[in-house]
Design a protein with these regions (language model features):
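Alpha-helical transmembrane segments of multi-pass membrane proteins
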Residues: 1-769
Length: 769
């Protein structure tokens, strides 16, 4: 394996590994989100575990390759690792799918009741057990392949090409093929197909080394396994679904671009719609939805035009239609749910006097594009769960509420929030007051109806809004609306003593934080509130982090960094520590900024999840372009010091870019407000591409510097491991803490500080040479 013709199979293998890794990663994330209730907190843990285990796998693959005295044992390991990775991926999907039942058999504190949310401990254990083995095997393939490539061809070009080929593979797998395959194929079959591609490419690498005739039995066995494996995967998919939903009559399991929807029958409960594993829709109208809708509608003297967000699965649309309205605009969180409800839930009652428009698009995208005349409403009912996820939170932010009220200054907002009639914990108060204070904007009146939930309406203080039970009953009778459940409980829910008590409790929170697009604090507060019920230690961790101010974090980080640099300078170990630390720090910064961009993109563009896949792909293309550009730079680099100077320049550029990311996002959304939707999407693609390029250019430069003291292939694998190690911590902290607690602006500022500290660290290495 010494010429370009013989290296072609290895190049194809690197691309195939990237493709399989990208696809399996997306499939696993989707499966884990189903059992983790769709929480982005779980996404951070998932990505963190993947990157951490991947770092170990890449380092292990490079280390084993360096110990081999010839290429033969290293090449023989390639198809073996591909087979192990495929098997691990299939086992991981089965484990994740059956995990709710498995945790139900564990003793405390791991025991989980059916329908109960996973806590941080459960998510961590499940991710380690399922994601870590797959990530280790996947990245061990890359570490092995890049080591082979480095031994075949000396110089910086192979390293840059390896990085670019892996990024291109991830683009195909994670940014495109994953979305196509997960919609057309079940997760097990999609994973098996991707793994088979990598395994065939691995066989080609082995055949180029040992000869096709020697590999003939293995090739025949692989062909037979692929032919027999696809029907086996289909059967395994059906079996695991039946085991997961044992006790239910499973009617359908449907994947949309956003979520997994299971429709099942269960005795007296009737037909239940599970969205990402959580019961979210039923055949009959739910009591809380019934109360929310009527409480909201009776706060307006003549609610003719109504905006309804969510609630079709719990009967909200039917309840709104019982009032004498002229127009109802209905939006779902996931537009794919509209067709599922039409298919499996009872049809809507036709009311000629009320024009019910079912919108199959995202609400916020509609608010940007619809004519002003179509955005005039009297009442906006948020028949949504509390903002447990960032996806839900984007409907509770100041910007969303402002856009809804732009053409309807007298509009009434109605929410169903966590609450009781008798007790409000500090976590519950923090969450409720943040949402209500954001909606009231300091100028609107808030009326409430305490029950098993806190029903709240926020509107103009015209004297019509009321919390009096007799007034509500009189209005209901005047409008000729039949609501038997409402009339039976309204006197209890609007008991003056209960209402006054809850108002006093809410007033305990002085100056609640405003929930905004760029600082989704309500999402963070809801995480604390939800975890307090299922995972008290995890809730205490998040609540404790909330007490730490960002300036304090920056001060302590800079102080510790200065101490470390002094120790490194005194020991004269900068050449050992500086560059790996810089790459790990770059991985951290890149992951934080990329998650911030993804979050901002999701807020503005909505549920165009195929485009989010392309956005991730744009980052990977940027990585590839940056790696290739660095390879060209290194062709004209004759001294190690020149490579270090170029790495310093890349770090400075990353620090400056971090500072302007919030302004770029704000400017992009402002400029594109009256432009076609594709312009906004293209702007985010470009932003992600530039970020990827700034990160990708550093990997070959760092590898070239480290190659002065160790084998180039091992140096490349080590730098890749350092990048993944930093990215793992960035994934966990960005999704769980940095972005929701400190906002995109605060997270970007911290990233800039980290980048400039890394500049100082690498400059120290230059001074010691």
């Amino acid at each position: 394996m010494a010429n370009g013709h013989q290296s072609l199979p290895l190049q194809l293998f690197i691309v195939a590994v990237g493709l399989a890794s990208g696809l399996v990663q997306v499939v696993l994330v989707r499966q884990l989100l189903i059992v983790c209730s769709g929480s982005e907190l779980a996404v951070g843990v998932i990505l963190g575990i993947w990157l951490l285990a991947g770092a170990a796998g890449s380092w292990w693959g490079g280390r084993r390759a360096r110990r081999d005295t010839s290429l033969s044992p290293t090449v023989a390991r390639v198809p073996f690792l591909a087979a192990v990775c495929t098997a691990m991926g299939l086992a991981a999907i089965c484990l994740v799918r059956l995990s709710p039942d498995l945790f139900g058999k564990f003793p405390e504190p791991l025991f989980v009741m059916p329908g109960e949310m996973f806590g941080l401990l459960h998510v961590l254990i499940l991710c380690i057990a399922s994601v870590a083995p797959v990530a280790f095997a996947a990245e061990a393939q890359f570490g092995t392949a890049v080591s082979i490539y480095g031994r075949m061809q000396e110089g910086p070009d192979p390293v840059a090409r390896s990085y670019a080929m892996d990024a291109i593979g991830h683009l195909i797998g994670g940014g495109a093929a994953a979305y196509v395959l997960t919609l057309w194929l079940d997760p097990l079959t999609a994973t098996f197909c991707a793994g088979s591609i990598a395994l065939m490419a691995g066989m080609a690498v082995a055949a180029s080394r040992f000869g096709a005739s020697r590999m003939k039995p293995q090739i025949i066995a692989l062909t037979a396994a692929v032919i027999l494996g696809i029907p086996l995967m289909l059967a395994l998919h059906t079996l695991t679904l039946q085991l997961r939903w044992s006790g239910y009559d499973l009617m359908a399991s449907i994947d949309t671009l956003h979520s997994n929807v299971v429709v099942a029958e269960h005795g007296v409960k009737g037909r239940v719609f599970f969205i990402n594993g959580q019961p979210s829709g039923y055949t009959e109208t739910m009591p809380d939805t019934h109360l929310l809708v009527h409480f909201a509608m009776l706060q307006h003297p003549d609610p003719q035009n109504v905006l309804l967000i969510g609630g079709r699965g719990t009967g909200a649309l039917e309840e709104v239609a019982t009032h004498p309205v002229s127009r109802v605009d209905y939006f779902e969180l996931d537009p794919g749910l509209v067709d599922i409800y039409d298919r499996f839930r009872r049809p809507l009652v036709d009311r000629p006097e009320a024009a019910i428009t079912v919108h199959r698009q995202d609400l916020r995208a509609y608010l940007r594009s619809a004519p002003d005349g179509e955005r005039r409403w009297d009442v906006a009912i948020f028949a949504l769960p509390p903002p447990l996820t960032a996806v839900l939170n984007r409907h509770y932010t100041r910007e969303c509420l402002r856009d809804i009220a732009q053409q309807s200054p007298e509009i009434i907002f109605a929410f169903g929030l966590p609450g009781t009639q008798t007790y409000y914990s500090q976590d519950m108060l923090n969450l409720d007051t943040s949402i209500l204070y954001t909606a009231a904007a300091g100028k609107r009146k808030v009326v409430i109806m305490p029950g098993y939930s806190l029903f709240a309406a926020v509107g103009p203080d015209t004297g019509y809004m009321s919390e009096d039970a007799s007034t509500m009953l009189q209005r209901l009778e005047e409008r000729g609306v039949a609501a038997s459940y409402w009339t039976s409980v309204i006197s209890d829910h609007l008991d003056p003593m209960n209402v006054d008590y809850v108002h006093r409790e809410l007033q305990r929170i002085q100056s609640p934080p405003i929930n905004t697009d760029l600082q989704p604090i309500a999402y963070y507060l809801n995480q604390i509130y939800a975890l307090r019920q299922f995972d008290a230690p995890g809730a205490r961790v998040l609540a404790g982090l909330k007490q730490i101010a960002l300036p304090a974090i920056i001060r302590w980080f800079v102080l510790i960094a200065l101490v470390v640099m002094c120790v490194v300078a005194w020991l004269r170990k900068a050449d050992v520590v500086a560059v790996p630390t810089a790459i790990a720090g770059t991985g951290f910064v890149a992951m934080v900024l990329q998650l911030a961009v993804l979050y901002a993109f999701q807020i503005q563009v909505g549920y165009v999840y195929s485009l989010i896949g392309v956005l991730t792909g744009a980052f990977m293309v940027g990585l590839a372009a940056g790696g290739l550009f660095a390879g060209r730079l290194l062709r004209h680099t004759t001294e190690p010091q020149q490579a270090l100077l170029k790495l310093l320049g890349a770090l400075i550029a990353l620090g400056l870019f971090s500072l302007v990311v919030p302004a770029l996002i704000t400017g992009l959304t402002g400029v594109s407000a009256h432009l076609p939707g594709w312009f906004l999407a293209a702007g985010f693609f470009l932003l992600s591409f530039v970020l990827g390029g700034m990160v990708g250019v550093q990997f070959p430069l760092a590898t070239e510097i480290q190659a002065q003291t160790e084998h180039r292939g091992f140096a490349a694998a080590s730098m890749y491991a350092a990048d993944l190690l930093g990215g793992s911590s960035g994934a966990v902290l960005a999704g769980a803490v940095l972005v929701p607690l400190y906002g995109i602006g605060g997270a970007s500022l911290l990233c800039a500080v980290i980048a400039f500290v890394l500049v100082a660290m690498c400059a120290l290495q230059g001074c010691q040479r």
